[in-house]
Curated annotation (Swiss-Prot):
Protein species of origin: Escherichia coli O157:H7
Binding note for cofactor: Binds 2 manganese ions per subunit.
Protein name per the record: Xaa-Pro dipeptidase
Documented EC number(s): 3.4.13.9
Cofactor(s) recorded in Swiss-Prot or TrEMBL: Mn(2+)
Disulfide bonds: none
Classification via Gene3D superfamilies: Creatinase/methionine aminopeptidase superfamily (3.90.230.10), Creatinase/prolidase N-terminal domain (3.40.350.10)
PANTHER family documented for this protein: XAA-PRO AMINOPEPTIDASE 3, XAA-PRO DIPEPTIDASE
Length: 443
C-alpha cells in the first residue's frame, strides 16, 4: 500500500487544483481558512468542546487546535499558522512534524490576535472561510468575501469525490469503529447498562465522548425506536431484548458511521427480522453502481421493506407494490437510506447537481432523504435501512381504510424491541462498490 505521506502529497495537489479553479472563477487571489475559536458557555468561563472547521481539516489533519489559519492560493505551498501559545493553564499541542508537514509551511503563532501582522498587507481580494465572520472583518477582509457562497458551493461539490488519501483515512476510521462495535456487543451480552456499554465503546476506539464524530446512539430495548437516542441510562435493563448501536470514529478528521442491531435471543421473530433486514441491506448494496441516482436505491429499499412486512405478517392482505404506493412502508422506515460521508458525518453537497450549487431536493414523498446525487466514482455513502415500531408514526394508521392491513397484535409484540437499523459505509468505484465495513468482517 502507498504510504500516507505520498497519498497526502497527491491529496494536496488535488486541493490546490480545486483552489486554483475556484479562485479563477470567483476572481479571488487566495483563501484564508480559519480552524475556529473556542466559545464560552453563556455566563461562564468554561468553553464548549472545540469542533474544527471542516474546510480547514480538509487540508491538514489538525482537529483539536483553535486559532490556526491556512492561506492557500492554489500555486504556492499552503501556509499554516499553528497556534502555539505560552500557557501553563492548558495543554499546548507541539508544532507538528508528521507525514504531512513536508507539504505545508508550518509557522508558530504564539498569540491568537497576532495573525493580522503576518498576513499579506493587501487583503481586499482574499476570501475568508470560517466560523467567526467578525474576526475576518477585523482583519480587513471584505464583507462580500466572507464565506462566499459560490466558493463554498464549489469546494463542497468536489468534496464528494474522495482522494486516495481520504479513502485511506476513512478505512482507518472504519477499523476503530469496528473495534468499538465488537466491544459494545460483548458489553451488551454481559448485561451492562447503556452508559457502561458506551464507556466500553469509547475505550475500544480510543475516543473521548467529545472526539467521536457524532453522539453515540446506544439504545437498549424500546429505546431503539428513537432514531437519535442519546440519553444513556445508567441502570442496566432488567430484561435485555434488543440493542441498537449507531456509533462511529474519526481518523485524521474523517468519519466512520456504523450501525448494528442485535437480538438478545436468537430464536424469536425479532431476531429473524434483524437477519432479514441485514440480508436485504447486503442485497441492495450488491446492486449498486456508478451512474444511478441515490434516490432510486432509497425507493428500492422501500420495496424490500414491503417484502419483509409481508413475510413477517406485519402487513397482511396487500401487495408489496400497494404498500409502497400508499406509503404503508413509511412509518416503519421514516428516514433516508443514508447520506454522504467524509469530513462530516452528514457530509456536504448531498443535493448539489453541479459545481455551481444547483439544488435538487429530496422527493416530496421522502423529504428526509439526505442525498439526490447520481452516484459517481470516489463518492462515499452510508447505506442504513431500518424497520422501527414508533407509536407516534403508527398512530395515524390505526384508523382509516388501511388499518385492517396492519397486524396490530404483531406490532404490539415487537414494540418492546424498538427497532432495527443496519448501516455500512460504501465507496463507489468505476466498476465496483467497496463495502469498507464488511471488508473488516463486521457481521
Amino acid at each position: 500500500m502507498e504510504s500516507l505521506a505520498s497519498l497526502y502529497k497527491n491529496h494536496i495537489a488535488t486541493l490546490q487544483e480545486r483552489t486554483r479553479d475556484a479562485l479563477t472563477r470567483f476572481k479571488l487571489d487566495a483563501l484564508l481558512i480559519h480552524s475556529g475559536e473556542l466559545f464560552n458557555v453563556f455566563l461562564d468561563d468554561h468553553p464548549y468542546p472545540f469542533k474544527v472547521n471542516p474546510q480547514f481539516k480538509a487540508w491538514v489533519p489538525v482537529t483539536q487546535v483553535p486559532n490556526c489559519w491556512l492561506l492557500v492560493d492554489g500555486v504556492n505551498k499552503p501556509k499554516l499558522w499553528f497556534y502555539l501559545p505560552v500557557d501553563y493553564w492548558h495543554n499546548v499541542e507541539p508544532l507538528p512534524t508528521s507525514f504531512w508537514t513536508e507539504d505545508v509551511e508550518v509557522i508558530a503563532l504564539p498569540k491568537a490576535d497576532g495573525i493580522g501582522s503576518l498576513l499579506p498587507a493587501a487583503r481586499g481580494n482574499i476570501g475568508y472561510i470560517g466560523p467567526v465572520p467578525e474576526r475576518a472583518l477585523q482583519l480587513g477582509i471584505e464583507a462580500s468575501n466572507i464565506n462566499p457562497k459560490g466558493v463554498i458551493d464549489y469546494l463542497h461539490y468536489y468534496r464528494s469525490f474522495k482522494t486516495e488519501y481520504e479513502l485511506a483515512c476513512m478505512r482507518e476510521a472504519q477499523k476503530m469503529a469496528v473495534n468499538g462495535h465488537r466491544a459494545a456487543e460483548e458489553a451488551f451480552r454481559s448485561g451492562m447498562s447503556e452508559f457502561d456499554i458506551n464507556i466500553a465503546y469509547l475505550t475500544a476506539t480510543g475516543h473521548r465522548d467529545t472526539d467521536v464524530p457524532y453522539s453515540n446512539i446506544v439504545a437498549l430495548n424500546e429505546h431503539a425506536a428513537v432514531l437519535h437516542y442519546t440519553k444513556l441510562d445508567h441502570q442496566a435493563s432488567e430484561e435485555m431484548r434488543s440493542f441498537l448501536l449507531d456509533a462511529g470514529a474519526e481518523y485524521n478528521g474523517y468519519a466512520a458511521d456504523l450501525t448494528r442491531t442485535w437480538s438478545a435471543k436468537s430464536d424469536n421473530d425479532y431476531a429473524q427480522l434483524v437477519k432479514d433486514v441485514n440480508d436485504e441491506q447486503l442485497a441492495l448494496i450488491a446492486t449498486m453502481k456508478a451512474g444511478v441516482s441515490y434516490v432510486d436505491y432509497h425507493i428500492q429499499f422501500h420495496q424490500r421493506i414491503a417484502k419483509l412486512l409481508r413475510k413477517h405478517q406485519i402487513i397482511t392482505d396487500m401487495s408489496e407494490e400497494a404498500m409502497v404506493e400508499n406509503d404503508l412502508t413509511g412509518p416503519f422506515m421514516p428516514h433516508g437510506i443514508g447520506h454522504p460521508l467524509g469530513l462530516q458525518v452528514h457530509d456536504v453537497a448531498g443535493f448539489m447537481q453541479d459545481d455551481s450549487g444547483t439544488h435538487l431536493a429530496a422527493p416530496a414523498k421522502y423529504p428526509y432523504l439526505r442525498c439526490t446525487r447520481i452516484l459517481q466514482p470516489g463518492m462515499v455513502l452510508t447505506i442504513e435501512p431500518g424497520i422501527y415500531f414508533i407509536e407516534s408514526l403508527l398512530a395515524p394508521w390505526r384508523e382509516g381504510q388501511f388499518s385492517k392491513h396492519f397486524n396490530w397484535q404483531k406490532i404490539e409484540a415487537l414494540k418492546p424491541f424498538g427497532g432495527i437499523r443496519i448501516e455500512d459505509n460504501v465507496v463507489i468505484h468505476e466498476n465496483n462498490v467497496e463495502n469498507m465495513t464488511r471488508d473488516l468482517k463486521l457481521a
